[in-house]
Amino acid sequence: MSIPLPDVALTELSATRAPLDWVGMDGIDVPILLDEPEFAYPVHARAEVQVDLPDPAIKGIHMSRLYRLLDGFAGRDRLNPASLAVLLREMVFSHADCNSTRARLTLAFSLLCRRPALLTQGLSGWKSYPVRLEAVWEAGRLSLDATLQIGYSSTCPCSAALTRQLIEQAFVERFSAAGQVEPAAVAAWLQRNATLATPHSQRSVAEVRVRIPEGATRLGLLALIERIETCLGTPVQTAVKRADEQAFARLNGQNLMYVEDAARKIRQAVAEGFSQFSVSVRHVESLHPHDAVASSSS
């Protein structure tokens, strides 16, 4: 004879009665299939999933229901705004006996993108872009935010100007009494002395959060990444040979930027495609033991 298993979430009342904004699970490992043409392979994601518990008389939610819905989604559907809306709506329906009205899903993963070298044909490497998706179903509507981290290089304009001044002073000191100077002599001097001072530069990180527009059929993550990298002009490279490293040095010289410049460039680029967004940039200074930061939002 089968003996019924107890379910205290249904049969007992909470000793302390209060509504809860969110209840659920954090750190669930799942494979996710992105509905993006550039990503045919599954990505490993860490998921957070919750529903609200507005009724203070109900002791707890049914976490296994949320887990099974998420697990079925991960192995079945491609992730896009429409499929997320269906999943979250099902999570709310699964907790009708808890009087839940809202559901929330957060997915954290990294996009691996193949990036070609700047000049060398056939040379490329993998670059990782951390992504965080936050989807909420409330009042019959989906709100979906995407946060991306993008690495780039920044060279300080002030440091570049100070460097140029030192090189200029050294050049004048060497050739001021020489009268007419042959180009070959100038070239030889520059070969030896053009790096008697160098501007400081550093690896930098932009974190961009956007609200995916209602009616969007896809997330458009790679398009957003490329828009940001293009506006900055100095994306961090993967595999390089000397010609590529030289081209990267040229890009840094052509795109000198303070942290303020980077934040404004990104803001302008993101605002062309999204009405709700925030931008945060961090330059991990090589001159200082602290970072330079700037942020902006819509």
UniProtKB/Swiss-Prot annotation:
Substrates-to-products reaction catalysed: GTP + H2O = 7,8-dihydroneopterin 3'-triphosphate + formate + H(+)
Keyword tRNA processing applies: no
InterPro entries linked to this entry: GTP_cyclohydrolase_FolE2, GTP_cyclohydrolase_FolE2/MptA
One BP term from GO: tetrahydrofolate biosynthetic process
UniProt KW keywords: Hydrolase
Domain of life: Bacteria
Pathway: Cofactor biosynthesis; 7,8-dihydroneopterin triphosphate biosynthesis; 7,8-dihydroneopterin triphosphate from GTP: step 1/1
Record-linked Pfam families: GCHY-1 (PF02649)
MF annotations from Gene Ontology: GTP cyclohydrolase I activity
Function comment: Converts GTP to 7,8-dihydroneopterin triphosphate.
Family designation: Belongs to the GTP cyclohydrolase IV family.
NCBIfam families according to UniProt: PRK13674.1-1
Name of the featured protein: GTP cyclohydrolase FolE2
